[in-house]
UniProtKB/Swiss-Prot annotation:
Predominant place of localization: mitochondrion
Taxonomic source organism: Mus musculus
PANTHER family in alphabetical order: 2-METHOXY-6-POLYPRENYL-1,4-BENZOQUINOL METHYLASE, MITOCHONDRIAL, METHYLTRANSFERASE
EC number, UniProt record: 2.1.1.201
Protein's name in the database: 2-methoxy-6-polyprenyl-1,4-benzoquinol methylase, mitochondrial
Associated pathway: Cofactor biosynthesis; ubiquinone biosynthesis
Residue span of the annotated presequence: 1-49
Keywords noted in UniProt: Membrane, Methyltransferase, Mitochondrion, Mitochondrion inner membrane, S-adenosyl-L-methionine, Transferase, Transit peptide, Ubiquinone biosynthesis
Keyword Nucleus set for record: no
């Protein structure tokens, strides 16, 4: 059951204040008030701590958030088409594999973070619907005494074709969500979907709410990846699974050289021709190179509290699927 609105506001605002104040020195707390250590830190250290990267550019943390928002606001309407063009359609196979690796059953509660255009959510719904229909057929086969009319009526009376499954699509960008909602209507996905405007670093959901958390090609755009991972861990139920599909680092020198050539010389040109936006796709290419390699990202997932963390390289490591469990 969803929390009352007042509780949600407290969760969002209250938790944000709690983090901002750094907790306290009361028994059981492990962090001091932020001003307790300011005297020992130089202004240059404070400045560096507030800096991050936007592609290859060094920017303030606040500036990165607004820049990333602008990128996806600009590309939202051409986002899916550009994915097809940039990957030659291979991204579809990667996402299909992510769903097969998840193997969701009817009743699964999914949170798809940074999932604005709905690619993962729609695949999830199609998969669980097929699973639910297979389960129904098995059940009907065991009821040998039913007539065909009774079987047909039983199917007609089935109101929930998803077996109670729900895909919650959460994205920080309104334009991406707008595109996803329109796609859902166009593709006939009318049930089992929820659309939420939210920040990966401060999710507007209760603890232990979801069975699976997915994020596909989104986590490298987050300013504080460690906070996003901690939030993923928080909102998953005990036993829940974290799955991340993201670009990786290619180890083969020859393939890496060809990949760099294609990424830096071809993708921005495609972005300019198809979407009329060179700079946004230049950033997206640079953001891939700034993202941690597969082993380092695995360590970050473990640091967030996940266990049994593994990853699988796809297409020679151009992308990888990382998996972890909240145990």
């Amino acid at each position: 059951m969803a929390a009352p609105r007042c509780c949600v506001l407290w969760r969002v605002c209250g938790r944000g204040w709690w983090r901002a104040t750094g907790h306290c020195r009361l028994p059981g707390c492990h962090r001091s008030w932020p001003w307790a250590t300011l005297g020992t830190r130089s202004l240059s250290q404070e400045k560096r701590a507030a800096e991050t990267h936007f592609g290859f550019e060094t920017v303030s943390e606040g500036e990165k958030g607004s820049k990333v928002y602008q990128v996806f606001e600009n590309v939202a309407k051409k986002y899916d088409l550009m994915n097809d063009m940039m990957s030659l359609g291979i991204h579809r196979a990667w996402k299909d594999l992510l769903i097969r690796k998840m193997h969701p059953l009817p009743g699964t509660q999914l949170l798809d973070m940074a999932g604005g255009t709905g690619d993962i959510a729609f695949r999830f719904l199609s998969y669980v619907q097929a699973q639910h229909q297979r389960r129904q057929r098995r059940q009907l086969r065991t009821q040998q005494n039913l007539s065909w009319e009774e079987i047909a009526k039983k199917y007609q009376n089935e109101e929930d074709s998803l077996g109670g499954s729900l895909a919650t699509v959460c994205d920080i960008n309104r334009e991406m969500l707008k595109v996803g909602k329109q796609k859902a209507l166009d593709q006939g996905h009318t049930a089992g979907l929820a659309w939420v405007l939210g920040d990966a670093e401060e999710l507007p959901f209760d603890d232990d709410s979801f069975d699976v958390y997915t994020i596909a090609f989104g986590i490298r755009n987050v300013t504080h990846i460690d906070q996003a991972l901690q939030e993923a861990h928080r909102v998953l139920k005990p036993g829940g699974r974290f799955l991340c599909l993201e670009f990786g680092q290619v180890n083969d020198p020859l393939i890496s050289r060809l990949y760099d050539l294609y990424s830096f010389q071809v993708i921005p040109v495609i972005g300019e021709v198809i979407a009329g936006d060179w700079k946004s796709y230049q950033y997206l290419v640079e953001s891939i190179r700034k993202f941690p390699n597969q082993e380092d990202f695995k360590d970050m997932i473990e640091d967030a509290g996940f266990q049994r963390v593994t990853y699988e390289n796809l297409t020679t490591g151009i992308v990888a699927i990382h998996s972890g469990f909240k145990l």
